[in-house]
């Protein structure tokens, strides 16, 4: 149990650190690609956990790979992608539905995951969940073709954007809040 707690702490830390990187990649390559890549990494990590041979396999699979994978299909990137394909007059309703769906998903997923562990054992439960998560990119097909958002402002490099954001106190406080609370 103690080692599993360490694995989950590593996952949370890697997830938190990789969030801004996922955002930068989404800006450069598009949200859909990052969402799909993240979901596939997440599925690979879950599958690897299911076939793991020792505790360090669990650290690498659930801690590192799943931590990185979770940074892709997050609300921020999903809402950004959805916002590009939904008309302005429906955007608030759709955003609310997406956000509520994530909460509802957690409400059902946690006890459902426990039922899977009890029915299949933890290894097969991870493999089953890996297959389920690997299907997630199919949902992103509906978001394809979203037009790129063109900025009227000057082009910035990633580092210029980071330095500008770092100089804004609101961004720093928001980042600290998310770092502490997730």
Model-derived features: where do they sit?
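Helix-loop junctions at membrane interfaces in 12-TM secondary transporters
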Residues: 51-61
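Cytoplasmic helix-loop-helix junction between adjacent transmembrane helices
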Residues: 62-100
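Juxtamembrane intracellular "pre-TM" segments in multi-pass secondary transporters
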Residues: 147-174
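Helix-loop-helix hairpin linking two adjacent transmembrane segments in secondary transporters
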Residues: 97-144
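Helix-to-loop junctions at the C-terminal end of transmembrane segments
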Residues: 18-30
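Residue-level signature of mid-helix packing/kink "hotspots" within the transmembrane helices
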Residues: 12-20, 106-107
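C-terminal ends and interior cores of transmembrane alpha-helices
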Residues: 40-53
């Amino acid at each position: 149990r103690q080692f599993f707690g360490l694995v989950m702490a590593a996952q949370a830390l890697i997830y938190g650190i990789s969030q801004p990187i996922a955002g930068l990649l989404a800006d450069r390559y598009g949200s859909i690609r990052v969402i799909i890549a993240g979901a596939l990494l997440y599925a690979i990590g879950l599958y690897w956990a299911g076939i793991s041979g020792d505790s360090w396999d669990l650290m690498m699979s659930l801690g590192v790979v799943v931590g990185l994978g979770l940074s892709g299909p997050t609300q921020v990137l999903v809402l950004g992608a959805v916002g590009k394909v939904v008309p302005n007059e429906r955007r608030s309703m759709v955003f609310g539905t997406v956000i509520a769906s994530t909460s509802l998903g957690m409400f059902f997923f946690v006890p459902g995951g426990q039922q899977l562990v009890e029915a299949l054992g933890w290894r097969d439960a991870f493999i089953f969940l890996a297959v389920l998560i690997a299907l997630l990119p199919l949902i992103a097909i509906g978001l394809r073709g979203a037009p790129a958002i063109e900025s009227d402002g000057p082009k910035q490099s990633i580092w210029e954007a980071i330095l500008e954001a770092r100089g804004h106190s609101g961004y720093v406080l928001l980042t600290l809040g998310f770092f502490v609370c997730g």
